[in-house]
Amino acid sequence: MESYRGLWLKGAIVMALNMYEAGLTPVEIGLGERDFYIDVQSDSALSLQESEKFAQWKDHKYEIKDGKVTYNGKQILLQGDVTPSGEPRYFKVLNISVHHPSANVQLVRIRGIAFETKEQMDDYLQWLEKASETDHRIIGERMDLFSFHEESGPGLVLFHPKGQLIRNEMINYMREINASMGYQEVYTSHVFRTVLWKISGHYDTYRDKMLIFQKDDDELGIKPMNCPAHILIYKSRVRSYRDLPIRFSEFGNVYRWEKKGELYGLLRTRGFTQDDGHIFLREDQLKDEVKNLVRKTLDVLGKFGFKGEDVRINLSTRPDESIGSDEQWEKATKALLDVLKELNVPYVVKEKEGAFYGPKIDFDIRDSLNRWWQLSTIQVDFNLPERFKLEYVDEDGSKKRPVMVHRAIYGSLDRMIAILLEHFRGKLPTWLSPVQVRVLPISEDNLDYAKRVMDVLVQRGIRTEIDPSGETLSKRIKRGYDDGVPYLVIVGRKEASEEKVTIRARGNVEIKGVPLSRFVDELSLEIGNRDAENTLIKRIG
């Protein structure tokens, strides 16, 4: 898709200028995750058919400057940093919607795609049809996980109870990982004085994505990242070489004011939660720390089913513009390189693509739609310890500067949930599923036993509900599959008399006559192990 974005933007410009020539007023052009968009001022909604007449190639002469397209004196706002390219001859309008950026303004948003060849378009539309079956926004609405609302603002998600269950499971798992690695969990405020961001450098380099405001003669900023606050905790007391490494973790909410045309469900939001971690350590501790981080990251990704060729590791080295001494960069890069070699994992070296403050290791994963996503990162930082004058007392009593490592395994918790929903098509591993068992009594006569089965499961901490509706059993089974419930338990007169259950699982698997106690024990084992592969069906089937 990345290779098409220049074409899409060119197509959007062409289509917008066609509209302008027809007397319409396009005001903004940009790119979404899978298409382009054009916002048009209009007192009434354009129809799909009306908009399609503007979807054709024309070689307009225009100028792009300062984020605007200028054509015959008319200026249209251009969002994003992609360069328009190519000569798209094939257009497709995907949908049209109306939104109100303010009380007195109505805009019609047209979304579409554009390609140079019909083959490109046909291939993409086929891919898009498949992708729509796995669109996390559609799955999230169907499963009642989360929602977005005009009243709350674009890019700001509201997680519903079942969505919060998924978040809690992922956070609990990461808490266990952090505890096993010696992290101390902290909490930091969402708002800080901008003096903090000026020291860190974010005020100059990241200000366009920050929310900054004045209050009581002070300038404040909502945090786009957690690291400066963790640094202040480190600085709150004298640190000895014996204390290092010091590891802080936080499930921190951060806010980055992305352009509205770039927002896309949970994949690109303005507020999200990071599984953030920062380690302060001596240079001689860097290699062992990174080795442990790489191992744990691969373990976590594997727990979600991403392993082998579906994980790609990148080592990014020193860019032309950087801070830190040659010796520091050489030591840090060698440490990261040695770790990857000693662990015998395949990796790709990306020359000069490291951060300006240090080398890094990134982990990409491939989902069921063959898309690659950058998730986890391990970044060495020489910059912030220098800016904040961090110190520790060395063995000889001298003061030394620690190295800092930034680490996130999920990256964005929200984005990770979106990827998992699309990868599993809503059928999450049992331990992550909001509802793990749904009990289906064959008739009202079996309702008492169904309630007893549910009570036994709930007492073991298994998320269970009953569907006692008067609909047919086949309809209730289908609804359970559609809702992504891993296990449907069917109980009738025979099951009640024998203290057994009939299990219906994903893949239309049915196992009859399973003792209730065994089902509960095996399911507890599957959930407790967070095992997406060795399910109870494989053990008792």
Swiss-Prot record:
Binding site residues for Zn(2+): 227, 278, 406
Keyword tags: Aminoacyl-tRNA synthetase, ATP-binding, Cytoplasm, Ligase, Metal-binding, Nucleotide-binding, Protein biosynthesis, RNA-binding, tRNA-binding, Zinc
General function of this protein: Catalyzes the attachment of threonine to tRNA(Thr) in a two-step reaction: L-threonine is first activated by ATP to form Thr-AMP and then transferred to the acceptor end of tRNA(Thr). Also activates L-serine and transfers it to tRNA(Thr) but cannot deacylate incorrectly charged amino acid; unlike most archaea the editing function is found in a freestanding protein.
Cofactor(s) in the UniProt record: Zn(2+)
CDD domains linked to this entry: ThrRS_anticodon, ThrRS_core
EC number from the UniProt entry: 6.1.1.3
Gene name, Swiss-Prot/TrEMBL: thrS-cat
Localization terms from the record: Cytoplasm
Gene Ontology molecular function: any one: threonine-tRNA ligase activity
Cofactor note: Binds 1 zinc ion per subunit.
Catalysed reactions, as listed in the record: tRNA(Thr) + L-threonine + ATP = L-threonyl-tRNA(Thr) + AMP + diphosphate + H(+)
Similarity comment: Belongs to the class-II aminoacyl-tRNA synthetase family.
Subunit details: Homodimer. Probably interacts with its editing subunit.
One GO biological process term: threonyl-tRNA aminoacylation
Protein name (Swiss-Prot/TrEMBL): Threonine--tRNA ligase catalytic subunit
InterPro entries named in the record: aa-tRNA-synt_IIb, aa-tRNA-synth_II, aa-tRNA-synth_II/BPL/LPL, Anticodon-bd, Anticodon-bd_dom_sf, Thr-tRNA-ligase_IIa, Thr/Ala-tRNA-synth_IIc_edit, ThrRS_anticodon
